Amino acid sequence: MGDVAVETPANNVTPLTKAAPLDTIPNIDSLEGTGNDGSDEYATLKRLQRHLEYIQLQEEYIKDEQRSLKRELVRAQEEIKRIQSVPLVIGQFMEAIDQNTGIVQSSTGSNYVVRILSTLDREKLKPSSSVALHRHSNALVDILPPEADSSIAMLGENEKPDVTYADVGGLDMQKQEIREAVELPLTQFDLYKQIGIDPPRGVLLYGPPGTGKTMLVKAVANSTTASFIRVNGSEFVQKYLGEGPRMVRDVFRMARENSPAIIFIDEIDAIATKRFDAQTGADREVQRILLELLNQMDGFEQSSNVKVIMATNRADTLDPALLRPGRLDRKIEFPSLRDRRERRLIFSTIASKMSLSPEVDLDSLIVRNEPLSGAVIAAIMQEAGLRAVRKNRYNIIPRSDLEDAYAAQVKTGQEADRLEFYR
């Protein structure tokens, strides 16, 4: 027999670890006539060639499938964008029936069983969350941020008031009490824990109009690094049933998510008056808002890193359940009548920012007996400044501008009787 192409015996063939490229595989014709050893090698080679051809066919098929799936993905993404680009209806998610359907409430108050877009994250789809519905089919196509359809907003770092405690004249005791109840628990909570007491959860500021309640809260917002949420009590009263309690939950949820936080509710008497046997749906809705507020303040989800400040001019009308300890632990009164020391501090604080004539004597205004609140004193100084601007003066003349401003802002005799309904 002639020379054999493969000299290694069949029982000593080295195992193949990697398929060789086609161009490196020997020609089949070169293996002819190699005997039994050559026939085994030839059979192995043919088997490997068939396997390689099969793999190449599979590769081409997979590439075709990949290109087809990419086209389908692009079409699906374009369809989703088209659906979400049309004007959508804001609704509220109620509950999920299964993975693909759920119950939603539209802005008109009606409930619908709708399909849920498959691309939405089901973990973010929680009851009472705001959602976007298709205008024709009411299908749930998007999940909105919690504050997207709410008037509740949190003040950013650049939006906080520029009022400091030094800008608030007088009110030394009120400043100390509100700092102990609001700022200290947020900054030095360990002190309360070491003593073994719970810090105050809420503070009520009450007093006549113009006594500095809101201004002191502005100073609190400026001096603390905590998140600050401001809302007016009347904003909770909405057109549709259930919207008010939902807004209360949204406010406290936002505060807990951004804790430490301070919630300031101004004019709390709009929703927290004493409860009675309501005869109308509107009165019952206001009472439901109050119940939700009471639950959020001392319920199971209450947080020590969330402080509530409320302000009102009518503390006598508030519900006793709101005033009890555990909800509003500290009640700070802002008196309408200021003594001479308080007046001097207010006049000096306001006058320090103004250009006054050297002859100005504020003591002549301080010693007068008319009742002056902080807002009235600020109005006197502002009116004096406006009169100086009107006359193109750089300084305020005491006997003319200040006296005229005092007479314009402080009513006496018959003029005071006409404005008695404001008191």
Swiss-Prot record:
From the broadest rank down, the organism's phylogenetic lineage runs:
Eukaryota, Fungi, Dikarya, Ascomycota, Pezizomycotina
* GO CC, any one term: nucleus
- Disulfide bonding pattern of the chain: none
Database matches in SMART domains? AAA
GO MF: ATP binding; ATP hydrolysis activity
- UniProt keywords, alphabetically: ATP-binding, Cytoplasm, Nucleotide-binding, Nucleus, Proteasome
Q: What is this protein called?
A: 26S proteasome regulatory subunit 6B homolog
List, alphabetically, the Pfam families matched.
AAA, Prot_ATP_ID_OB_C
Q: What is this protein's gene name? A: tbpA
Q: Which organism is it from?
A: Aspergillus niger
Q: Which family does it belong to?
A: Belongs to the AAA ATPase family.
Q: Has keyword ATP-binding?
A: yes
Query: Is Nuclease a UniProt keyword of this protein?
Result: no
InterPro entries given in the database record: 26S_Proteasome_ATPase (IPR050221), AAA+_ATPase (IPR003593), ATPase_AAA_core (IPR003959), ATPase_AAA_CS (IPR003960), NA-bd_OB-fold (IPR012340), P-loop_NTPase (IPR027417), Prot_ATP_ID_OB_2nd (IPR032501)
